[in-house]
Structures are given as structure tokens and as C-alpha cells.
């Protein structure tokens, strides 16, 4: 069977094979979504080019990486923080005004994050040259004290973590860490959904970004090396 469909306003064709059922009829299974959205964190800017999340965007139902040709990035108004508990990761909840809050475009969905460009006027207004910092090579990253940077309550704050282990042979679980900051634990329970992409700084250098929460202990999580996001 030849199936014609629209993607990004363009007509495309795919060959599919229906399955014959025990009722002597044919059925075709399709998984169709027009778009996908979620809350995450921008990790870094270089000019007006950005990277975010630290991992790919995947479909919640199938777990498969989304094959995307583009999208938009929006400012999000956080309205509620559902704290994480053991075996129950929390999440950031927010609202997006799609016509008002568009600040850039997403050009790619990669294994170690999403990337694209922010509006130049938005960058000039919200980011200052004085905030720039060096990035660290993986061999500079050490176990011990580091900080997660986040705007969970609207203001930029840094939260102390302890890097427990370093792995150079994995894609985006390069660091294991434990949240030590009592304010962050009180606010989120540790790590929650929506914090993916939150930058991690050690010794004044950007070393990586939060990627995953440990379900059995939400005060622990994983992070990706910043170098792997840049690649």
C-alpha cells in the first residue's frame, strides 16, 4: 500500500504493508503526532547559538528519539514544582504563550541535546558578556564539589552538588552526582524533570549539564560532559 502524507507542508510517500487479522480483514497501525513539547533548560550560548537538555527529545510513549526537522524555543513561566520522591520523579510545570513567548528556533534534535538559534535582540537583552565562562575538557573534571546553575524560582542561583564518579566511555551519563544543597532538596526533592540541561560549573568552568535523575534516589543524578554536547 502506498501512503501519502504531509510533513512540514510537503507531500511525502511511504510504502506500508497492512496486516491481515483473524477476522479476514486488513489493518494498518499508525503512530501519528503533529508535534511534541516539554520543559527543559538551555545549557549554554555561543553568540546566539544555543544547546539545551543534554539528551535528545524522545516520545514519552515509545521511548524513541524524535526525528525532527525543526521547532521553536519559548520562554516558560514556571507555575508549580512537583517535588521528586523515591520511585516518583517530580517535574516542573509551566505555561507557554506560543504567540508571545517564541524566542528562537530549534534546528536539530541530537543525542546530547537540542540545538538552534535564539533571537539576537533577546540575547542582547538577557545575556551579558560578563557572564561568559570557559568550558572544561573532560580530563579537567574532578570528583567533588561543583554547582548546578538554575532559575527555578525566577532568579539565577547556584546549588552545591558532589560529583561521585566520572565515566568517559558513555554517551551522556558521564558524571554521577549527588545534590548536597538543602535549599534545592527542599524545593525540588533533588533532581526533577525540567532540570535537564541545567549547567554544572566546577572551578569556574562549565563542565556539563544535568541529564537524568536516579529514580531510586532523586537526590542523585547523571550529567553529560559539555564537550559531548558541543560535538
Where are these regions (language model features)?
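Short, solvent-exposed secondary-structure boundary/capping segments
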Residues: 25-30, 171-177
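Charged, low-complexity helical/coil segments in non-catalytic cytosolic or luminal regions
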Residues: 43, 48-174, 212-218
